[in-house]
């Protein structure tokens, strides 16, 4: 299949994103960088069509509440980034769906940018078929529903992974910016962000990585109730909600998961196995080692506390 002229491709995409989708995937197979951006745009357009359910419905109602208020600055409340954007969009009479589009687009763009960077740095991924299969694994492991309908946690998770990669692998200071924005988008990401900073400044090996993961699990299961009582207010209520409340272990949300959903959840947790393998095979001096340890710690926490929306996969 011959490549279309780039300008013709752009015209075709904006005339019919759906008809151009096969071309987008073909150009991704050819490892064209621009194709990843167009796929992120396509998924952003799909998000515009999604019915407002779950958290998205509440955020939509909040948009209309803010429309009747005179807000000119930052909305100082938990998850400040989203609520400030909602307030500004309501004030300027910009459609709420644009926020949904932006969160989905930038989330996927960050994941795809991370994948493309790894692809460029590893000669073993020059094989188009292997690289494309790995990309499909990434694409289908990112939970579109979490980003589109939850907005905050899905986007915050993308910020955390992207920031951790920039900081731990590429040693770029702008990684701190993304890690700073993550808990401002969703408070639950403050622990993974702290984990990324620990991995950055503490020399880790496999055993120490396992130890930190176990300690993180014990702390999350044992002391979070005390933290929620001590902190009180909205932050305390949120911690309780995600640890022992609706979204916590044995919470109401877990009871609503069907048999097929449980099977999918447990299969998802098998993602820890390749991380363990890579931690054994890759030496600690490798720039990827710290990032792999960071990912493993997050997967370990996710596996046991069952906060199923913590990671995109």
What are these regions (language model features)?
Residues 57-65, 72-94:
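Short hydrophobic/aromatic helix or loop-helix immediately within or flanking a transmembrane segment
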Residues 174-197:
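Membrane-interface alpha helices of multi-pass inner-membrane proteins
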Residues 160-174:
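Membrane-interface transmembrane helices that cradle and orient dolichyl/undecaprenyl
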Residues 102-123:
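Transmembrane-helix motifs of polytopic, lipid-linked glycan transferases
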Residues 9-54, 215-222:
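Transmembrane signal-anchor helices characteristic of membrane glycosylation enzymes that use polyprenol
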Residues 52, 57-61, 66, 83, ...:
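Alpha-helical transmembrane segments and terminal signal-anchor/GPI-anchor hydrophobic tails
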Residues 129-150, 154-161, 188:
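Membrane-embedded helix bundles of polyisoprenyl
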Residues 94-97, 142-152, 305-311:
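Membrane-interface helix caps and helix-loop-helix hairpins in membrane proteins
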């Amino acid at each position: 299949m011959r490549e279309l002229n780039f300008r013709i491709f752009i015209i075709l995409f904006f005339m019919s994103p759906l008809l151009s989708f096969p071309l987008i995937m073909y150009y991704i197979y050819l490892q064209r960088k621009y194709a990843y951006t167009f796929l992120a745009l396509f998924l952003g357009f799909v998000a515009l069509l999604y019915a407002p359910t779950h958290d998205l419905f509440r955020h939509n109602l909040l948009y209309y509440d803010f429309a009747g208020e005179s807000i000119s600055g930052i909305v100082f409340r938990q998850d400040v980034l989203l609520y400030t954007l909602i307030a500004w969009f309501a004030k300027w009479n910009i459609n709420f769906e644009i926020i949904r589009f932006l969160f989905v687009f930038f989330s996927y763009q960050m994941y795809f940018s991370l994948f493309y960077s790894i692809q460029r740095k590893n000669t073993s991924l020059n094989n188009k078929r292997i690289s494309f299969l790995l990309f499909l694994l990434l694409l289908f492991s990112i939970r579109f529903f979490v980003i589109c309908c939850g907005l905050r946690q899905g986007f915050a998770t993308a910020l955390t992974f992207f920031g951790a990669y920039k900081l731990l692998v590429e040693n770029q200071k702008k990684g701190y910016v993304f890690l700073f924005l993550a808990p401002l988008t969703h408070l639950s990401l403050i622990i993974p962000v702290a984990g990324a900073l620990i991995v950055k400044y503490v020399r880790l090996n496999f055993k120490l990585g396992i130890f930190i993961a176990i300690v993180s699990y014990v702390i999350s299961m044992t002391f979070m109730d005390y933290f929620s009582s001590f902190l009180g207010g909205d932050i305390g209520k949120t911690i309780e909600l995600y640890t022992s409340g609706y979204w916590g272990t044995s919470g109401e949300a877990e009871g609503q998961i069907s048999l097929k959903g449980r099977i999918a959840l447990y299969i998802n947790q098998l993602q820890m196995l390749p991380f363990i393998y890579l931690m054994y095979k890759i030496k600690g001096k490798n720039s990827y080692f710290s990032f792999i340890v960071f990912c493993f710690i997050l997967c370990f926490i996710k596996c046991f506390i069952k906060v199923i929306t913590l990671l995109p996969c």
